[in-house]
């Protein structure tokens, strides 16, 4: 039977290396909602574009498609989002674009301070 145990650390330098390059951290629903709002405060986006942007802007973080869709559904139920389709020349079918309601911007802005603080606290250690 194969073991899925992590390799043992052989010295303190290995543990230090862990903090230099920690494993990716997956966002839960609350953090995913904040990520979606942070992006949509800047401009409209399509869901897979949000995933690509997270990977680019915060490579230490991960967001599953399932949790992303739960976050979008949550925001739609809160009546904070509009959706529309946009045709892109590079794609055959139109994209489902997400747009933050103008009257939801204040609520979204209130979450940006704790979201930014969380990002700062969970940023990789650099030396």
Task: Describe the residue ranges of each PLM region.
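Short, Lys/Arg-enriched N-terminal segment that forms or immediately precedes the first helix
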Residues: 5-26
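Amphipathic alpha-helical dimerization/coiled-coil segments
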Residues: 9, 103-127
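Pre-recognition alpha-helix immediately N-terminal to the DNA-recognition helix
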Residues: 34-35
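Short capping segments at the starts of secondary-structure elements
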Residues: 40-49
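DNA-recognition alpha helix
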Residues: 48-60
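Beta-hairpin "wing" of winged helix-turn-helix
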Residues: 76-93
């Amino acid at each position: 039977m194969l073991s899925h145990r992590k390799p043992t650390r052989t010295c303190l330098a290995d543990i230090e290396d862990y903090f230099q390059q920690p494993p990716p951290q997956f966002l839960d629903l609350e953090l995913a909602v904040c990520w979606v709002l942070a992006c949509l405060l800047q401009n409209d986006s399509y869901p897979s574009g949000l995933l690509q942007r997270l990977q680019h802007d915060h490579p230490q973080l991960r967001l599953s498609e399932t949790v992303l869709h739960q976050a979008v559904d949550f925001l739609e139920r809160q009546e904070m989002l509009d959706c529309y389709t946009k045709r892109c020349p590079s794609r055959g079918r139109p994209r489902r674009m997400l747009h933050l309601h103008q009257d939801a911007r204040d609520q979204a802005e209130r979450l940006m301070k704790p979201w930014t603080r969380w990002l700062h606290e969970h940023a990789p250690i650099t030396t």
